[in-house]
Amino acid sequence: MADAPRVLSVNLAVTGGATGIDKRPTSGAVAVRAPGPTGSGLAGDSIGNGALHGGDDQAVYAYAREDLDAWQATLGRALPNGIFGENLTTAGLDVNAARIGEQWVLGTAGLRLEVSRPRIPCRTFEQRLTVRGWMKTFTAAAVPGAYLRVLEAGPVRAGDEIRVVHR
């Protein structure tokens, strides 16, 4: 029997960065709530360009460790959790197969998220990876991860189980 899908790491932007894409794993629980029209859904996180990122429909970004591992092999370099600017690095869940409107419950404290859209890469993402043509390469691979909106606020921490409760 396969392990249950789970959160491998919760990643927050490095304080004082020019953009919010430089995210690093954090320890302990992080509060997640609907941010309104701008900002991140995770307490302590930041968004660099509020015109393109954040807000209720992009409150949380999830990306699978399995996809990071595939990119590691393709690019020939280590890709730590958070490198793609994801708030949640997951394991055991095909994030790319998630459907718009699909709902996930994380952990046991009632955090409920809804898949709102796939990621569309931006120039900052390409600059972060320092791979020429990265936006086109990433888009063509069709492994965008998922943006999520917050339906019910609650904490999230590394190790939390992810349950798909509505598809």
Locations of the language-model features?
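Electropositive, beta-rich accessory/interaction domains or terminal extensions
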Residues: M1-E126, G133
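Short, ordered beta-strand-loop transition motifs
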Residues: P25, A140-P144
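Short alpha-helix capping/helix-loop boundary micro-motifs
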Residues: T90-G92, G145-E152
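Loop/turn positions that initiate beta-strands
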Residues: G101, A153, R157-G159
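A general structural signal for short secondary-structure boundary/capping elements
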Residues: L106, R149-V150, D160-E161
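An acidic- and aromatic-residue-enriched active-site/binding cleft used to recognize and process polar
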Residues: P118, L151-A153, R167
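Short beta-strand-turn/beta-hairpin segments enriched in glycine/proline and small hydrophobics
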Residues: R128-A140
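A hydrophobic, small-residue-rich beta->alpha segment in the mid-to-C-terminal subdomain
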Residues: A158-R167
